[in-house]
Curated annotation (Swiss-Prot):
InterPro entries: Enolase-like_C_sf, Enolase-like_N, Enolase_C-like, Mandelate_racemase_C, OSB_synthase_MenC1, OSBS_N. GO terms for biological process: menaquinone biosynthetic process. Its cofactor is a divalent metal cation. Belongs to the mandelate racemase/muconate lactonizing enzyme family. MenC type 1 subfamily. Converts 2-succinyl-6-hydroxy-2,4-cyclohexadiene-1-carboxylate (SHCHC) to 2-succinylbenzoate (OSB). This is o-succinylbenzoate synthase. Its EC number is 4.2.1.113. It is an enzyme of class 4 (lyase). Keywords: Lyase, Magnesium, Menaquinone biosynthesis, Metal-binding. The gene is menC. Mg(2+) binds at residues 162, 191, 214.
Length: 323
């Protein structure tokens, strides 16, 4: 006997979370609970505004159609919006006990704001020092100066930077001018510095600063391949699609000799813990990019270890549909 519950959550965000052109006041998504006999499987469907191709309403419509078919004994379709494909495939994998329980709860802290506070936090970080900084929000020159100061002050620090394609080539060069050439190798990667792939490639070749593909991974013409100056592929399952698609991307990335990084699209704690399990399974040697929980004011159903945020139980969520 197959049974389904589809829930909707809406969690208030901390002030100041801006996605491209809009301030995100709440994080809204769907939680799927599959049941077959005694077995349970959970999944999260949470398109990210400004980044996902599908809206939450479109995702809900697609999920409802699939879940009704699933209850009737059908398998989930392969042709689904990415967030729906990811959430349903996670729930199915949990149900079938194919998603390992072991998780990688290490996270590259997402840093923003005051360089002095940043310095104190990074200095106190145990083990491998890897942090992520969003660049491109302020002046490129300021970004370059902060990166340079941090790398100079903390000799064992590696930085992951993310520009979200926000720079012209001239601005990207302005950033690079303020990072000493001797420190550039400790930038693990800079995600998509320029507005076009070709400009980003040229930037990497000419500055010696490694880049990573992120937005490009979701474009129809993208192929994983080794090329000069590219060191990593950032995989955001909510934006990419099913577990099978993520597995294939990781495999292709490793075969090309590149680093694969599993990364968050600001999922709830339930989705984040599943991403931590996925990272432990598929990319055990790489710290995942999952430091987004503190952007929210509550957790959902499954808590993240050591988080003190309040936890919403399933009973506190709205039920969209139940079989």
């Amino acid at each position: 006997m197959r049974r389904v519950t589809l829930y909707r959550y809406s969690v208030p965000m901390e002030a100041g979370v801006v996605l491209r052109n809009q301030r995100l006041k709440t994080r809204d998504g769907l939680i799927v609970r599959l049941q077959e006999g005694e077995r349970l499987g959970w999944g999260e469907i949470a398109p990210l505004p400004e980044f996902s191709v599908e809206t939450l309403a479109e995702a809900e419509s697609a999920a409802l159609e699939q879940l009704q078919s699933w209850v009737a004994g059908q398998a989930f379709s392969d042709a689904l919006p990415p967030s729906v494909a990811f959430g349903l495939s996670c729930a199915q994998a949990e149900l079938d006990q194919h998603l390992p329980q072991a998780a990688d709860y290490r996270k590259a802290p997402l840093c923003s704001g005051d360089p002095d506070e940043l310095f104190e936090m990074l200095q106190a970080m145990p083990g491998e020092k890897v942090a992520k900084i969003k660049v491109g929000l302020y002046e490129a020159v300021r970004d370059g100066m902060i990166v340079n100061v941090l790398l100079e002050a903390l000799p064992d620090l590696k930085l992951r930077l993310d520009a979200n394609r926000s720079w012209t080539r001239a601005k990207a060069d302005g950033f690079a001018r303020y990072v000493a050439p001797s420190l550039r190798s400790r930038i693990a990667f800079l995600e998509e510095p320029c507005k076009t792939r070709e400009e980003s490639r040229e930037f990497a070749r000419e500055t010696g600063i490694s880049i990573a593909w992120d937005e490009s991974v979701r474009e129809a013409d993208f192929r994983v391949e080794a090329e000069p100056g590219v060191s990593a592929i950032v995989i955001k399952p909510t934006l990419v699609g099913s577990l099978a698609r993520c597995q294939q991307l990781v495999k292709d990335t490793h075969q090309a000799g590149l680093t694969a990084v599993i990364s968050s699209s600001i999922e709830s704690s339930l989705g984040l813990t599943q991403l931590a399990r996925l990272a432990h399974w598929l990319t055990p040697d790489t710290i995942p990019g999952l430091d987004t929980l503190d952007l929210m004011q509550a957790q959902v159903i499954q808590g993240w270890p050591e988080s003190t945020l309040p936890l919403l139980a399933a009973e506190q969520l709205d039920v969209v549909w139940q079989s």
